[in-house]
Amino acid sequence: MPLWTHAELLAATGGAPSGVFDADGVAFDSREIGKGDLFFALKGEATDGHLFIEKAFANGAAGAIVSEPVDFPHILVTDTFEALQALGRAARLRMQGRVVGVTGSVGKTGTKEALFAALDRSSRGKAHRSVKSYNNHVGVPLSLARMPRDTEYGIFEMGMNHAGELRGLTALVRPHCAIVTTIAPAHIEFFKDESGIADAKAEVFEGLTDDGVAIIPRDNVHFDRLDTAARKYAKSTVSFGFSEKSDVRLLDHVSTKGGETLITAKLSGATMCYCLSQPGEHWISNSLAVLAAVEAVGGDLAAAGLAMAELGGLAGRGARHQIAVQNGTALLIDESYNANPASMSATLSELGKVDGRKIAVLGTMKELGDKSPEYHLALAEPLAAAKVDFTILVGEEMQILAEKLRAGVEGVSVIAHCASAHEALEVLNRELRVSDTVLVKGSNSMGLSAIVSSLVGGKS
C-alpha cells in the first residue's frame, strides 16, 4: 500500500485534483525526490518550489501539491505550506502507535537518534523519526507526513529560536511523551535570559496527549521551572540525571580505553546495566532520558540497552574518523554542525581525557547576542582544563578569546586565530602529526564542515 493514496491526499489537503496519483514518499526539495514521491512546491523568502516542478517530475515525482496550476499531475491548494501541515496532522491522526517529542538546548538530535535506535530495535523496524535536523515549522510537518501508517513509535525533534515556536510544533506532533534534554544558553540572543529559554522549551508539554509523560533534566538549574510547567499538562513527570532525587538516575559509570562507557542506572522498576558507545557525561545524560522515554512508551529496555551499545557518531555531531597524515594516522572528532557554551564545554572536557597531543579547532558560537564576548571568553577555562596543545580559533567573535589566551592562560600552549575555515585548514595541515587527536567544533554557519570534508577525503 502506498504511503498516501490519492483519496487520502485529497481528504487531508482539501485541494482540487488534476490527474490521479498515489505517493510513496514526500519531499519539498526536488533534489530529494525519488520515484513515486509527492513534491510540495513551497514558497519561501529565497525561492519558489514551483520553479522546480519540472526537475521534481524528471526525478520521478508521482504528483505535486501546488498553489499555481502546472502541466503535471497535481493537487491545487490555496497555500502549499498549510497543505503540508494538514498532511502532517492527518499522518498523526491515523497513527495508532506512541509518539515522543524531543527538544532542549543541547542534545536534541543525538537523543532523537538514540531513541530511534532503541525503539526501532524494540519494534523490529516499526519506528519512524525526523531525519537530519528537520525540527522547524517545515521539517516537523514534513517528518510527520513521511510517517508510515503502521508505525509503532514516532520520534520527532522540535527546535526553536523564539518563544511561541514550539507551541505550534507540539500541537502538530501531539506527543505521548515529551523530553527536554537540558536548558543552556543556545539562541540566547533572542531571549532576556536562560529562564526565557526554559519557558520556551516548556511549551513542548502543551501538546501532550491526555496520558502524556514529561521527561525533564533533574540536574539542570531550571528544573523547578520545567517541572512546574510540565505538571500543568502532563499526567505524570519523570526526572533523569545524576542527582539522587532523579527518577531515572546514574548509579555508576566506567569509561573504557575504546571510548565506550559502561553504565549502571536506576529506573522506576529496575536497575539496568548497559554499554554506551559514545563518550562523555552529556551522552550519559542523554542515555538516561532515552531509557526514561522507552519505559514511558512501553518499549523494550533490554533492546534499548543493546541499541545504545551500537550507536555511531553523527556527522557534525561527534562522528570520529581516522585520517591520513604523514607517516600514519590521526583521530578527527567532527563536531562541526553546532556549538554553544554548554556543548563547547562538554566536548572540550572529553577532549581533555584523550591521551597524546590534542588540537582544538573552534569556530564562533552564533546567536549569543550581547553575551557573546562573555561566553567566548569563558572558553578559556575548559580549554585550559583540557590541556589542549594547539588551539585554532576561527571567526571574528573568537578574537577576544585569542587575545586572552595570548596574554597567558595556564594550560593553553599554542594558539592561532584565523578569519575563515579555509585559513584554519591551512594552519591545521601544517600542524597535524601522527597520533594527534583533532576536535573541530563551531556553529554550522562558520563552515567548519569543509575542514572535516577535506581531512576525511584526504585533500589538503
Q: Where on the chain are the PLM-derived regions?
A:
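Active-site beta-alpha connecting loops in nucleotide-dependent enzymes
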Residues: 46, 314, 336-410, 417
